[in-house]
Amino acid sequence: MPEHILSGIKAIVAMKLRRKGLLQKEIAKIIKSDRSIVSHYLSGRYPKEKILNVAKIIEEMPPQYGAKFIHSLTDNKELAKNLIKELYGIKLFWDENSCIACGSCLGCAALTLDNFTVGIDEDTCHLCASCIFRCPTNSLKFIKEE
């Protein structure tokens, strides 16, 4: 069942990427699928409507919950990051005004703390939201990318 739900999310992301003008080859690379599967996604032949409905519910979730859910569906962190980024259009943000520099978020390899400043390595960050849930002051959050 998780594979089916993941297929629904991939289908929604494929359709979004197509609307942005990407080619099937480019979409296939982002969603880690072969081009024939992308063709099925874009034509509406796959997955079933029930699966797409579940994927749409995930898309409507607050990003931090959707991100955790998507990461639970696959062990491929790069795939999960690509899907989350395209599905929600987000990036991780640190609010320096509310941060107490407690270090709770530092279990994540993408974050560093130096002189009371949290650094975010966007290449290392998999948008898993673990740091968001660890932060006691809600200083880490997802925001829309511009």
UniProtKB/Swiss-Prot annotation:
<keyword id="KW-0411">Iron-sulfur</keyword>
<dbReference type="GO" id="GO:0016491">
    <property type="term" value="F:oxidoreductase activity"/>
</dbReference>
<dbReference type="Pfam" id="PF00037">
    <property type="entry name" value="Fer4"/>
</dbReference>
<feature type="binding site">
    <location>
        <position position="131"/>
    </location>
    <ligand>
        <name>[4Fe-4S] cluster</name>
    </ligand>
</feature>
<keyword id="KW-0677">Repeat</keyword>
<dbReference type="GO" id="GO:0051539">
    <property type="term" value="F:4 iron, 4 sulfur cluster binding"/>
</dbReference>
<dbReference type="GO" id="GO:0046872">
    <property type="term" value="F:metal ion binding"/>
</dbReference>
<feature type="domain" description="4Fe-4S ferredoxin-type 2">
    <location>
        <begin position="116"/>
        <end position="145"/>
    </location>
</feature>
<dbReference type="InterPro" id="IPR017896">
    <property type="entry name" value="4Fe4S_Fe-S-bd"/>
</dbReference>
<feature type="binding site">
    <location>
        <position position="125"/>
    </location>
    <ligand>
        <name>[4Fe-4S] cluster</name>
    </ligand>
</feature>
<keyword id="KW-0004">4Fe-4S</keyword>
<feature type="binding site">
    <location>
        <position position="128"/>
    </location>
    <ligand>
        <name>[4Fe-4S] cluster</name>
    </ligand>
</feature>
<feature type="domain" description="4Fe-4S ferredoxin-type 1">
    <location>
        <begin position="90"/>
        <end position="115"/>
    </location>
</feature>
<keyword id="KW-0479">Metal-binding</keyword>
<feature type="binding site">
    <location>
        <position position="135"/>
    </location>
    <ligand>
        <name>[4Fe-4S] cluster</name>
    </ligand>
</feature>
<keyword id="KW-0408">Iron</keyword>
<protein>
    <recommendedName>
        <fullName>Ferredoxin-type protein FwdE</fullName>
    </recommendedName>
</protein>
<dbReference type="InterPro" id="IPR017900">
    <property type="entry name" value="4Fe4S_Fe_S_CS"/>
</dbReference>
